[in-house]
Amino acid sequence: MTAFAVAPVFAAGAASAQDVADTPPWPPVATFSILGYDPETGEIGGAVQSRVFSVGNGVLWGEAGVGMVATQAIVDVSYGPQGLDLLELGYSPEVVVQTILAADPDPDPERWTVEGRQFSVMDAEGNVATHTGTRSSAWAGTSSARTSRRRATFWPVPR
């Protein structure tokens, strides 16, 4: 089985062996999501893991024959439905990402900034585009590959 996958990753606050003794202002938060496409069957899917309770209603969005969207970090849940609507209109994932970002009103630039948003868009053919804002966290990133083996693993590289 070959698969296309993109894994956006977010962690609130930097983490390293040297920081273990430091006490963060709140417990560390991390969310990992993955979108996948199987070219043999045309199936798409996604999964999310998070320390944040009950993220399922705000991270993954999908529609058969259209695609999937994963939103995390400083989330605007409207990105999911917007992304699916634009994909259904025939826009490429790259144009979807650009269009959504350009239309974001950035209502609270100090605390809830568009620069903290992170999301991925995948169409029904496995084409993908991602965005990781410069203020999403000290350790955040994405990784994608056109094909992966079942046992292959990959980890995003911290910026």
Residue spans for each PLM region:
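Alpha/propeptide regions of enzymes that mature by internal proteolysis
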Residues: Q18-H131, R135-R159
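Boundary at the C-terminal end of the N-terminal hydrophobic targeting segment
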Residues: A11-D19
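Bacterial N-terminal signal peptides
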Residues: M1-A12
